Amino acid sequence: GLVTKKFNDFFLVDLKNHGDFENSEKFLCKVRKSINFKDQLIYVGDEVVIENIDLKSKRAVITSLKKRKNLLVRPSVANISNIYITFSVEEPELNLSQVNRFLISAESMGVEVSLVLTKCDLISNTRRSLLIDKFEKWGYQTITLNLERSDYFNNFLAELKQKKCSIFMGPSGVGKTTLLNMIIPGLQNSTAPVSNKIKRGKNTTRNVELFSISNQSYIVDTPGFNMQPL
């Protein structure tokens, strides 16, 4: 199964598409005391093997940890397939040097990296086109989101549902939480306004958790970043 949440010594493991479980079926698990993972911790996103499954209480025991493909350090999440570097074009204003630092950090993961530009309803179509051209010349797919154009979001959501495990990375206040609330109905993470003084947002997400958005896809809900993860 897939570890979708971690808290204290417990792990929430989803058995969707594993064995007899076609739909999402989550179990609260602890690691078997006799198991030694060679000092290797278990993270959200890890694939694990569970036994002693109790269908009534939804409890089980983790007996082994499968080899992971990658591990993001901050926040700690494993087996990412896609990273979407997310920045707003206004409020706060786009900072190209900061975008570059996030891109460099993401590239070190060895996964597919794309750019998402939010709040594009605050700029002209001309500037939007110039930004797309600039970043695509850098070699990155660039997705623009506009509150007045639902088709932009719907096209992006369709793309996300084709990916295995996607994460949004970027500074606070750029709209990651709002975007996650749109992608995952019922999530309802709180949002916070951008500070007029420091021109940055406040982190509104506290715990790392995976949410299923299709039979094959998950989205990582993570704490925001105030600065570049380098």
Task: Name what the model sees in each region.
Residues G1-L96:
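N-terminal accessory targeting/assembly segments
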Residues D121-V174:
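Canonical P-loop GTPase G-domain recognition
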Residues N82, E112, K164, N215-Y218:
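Loop/turn-to-beta-strand initiation segments
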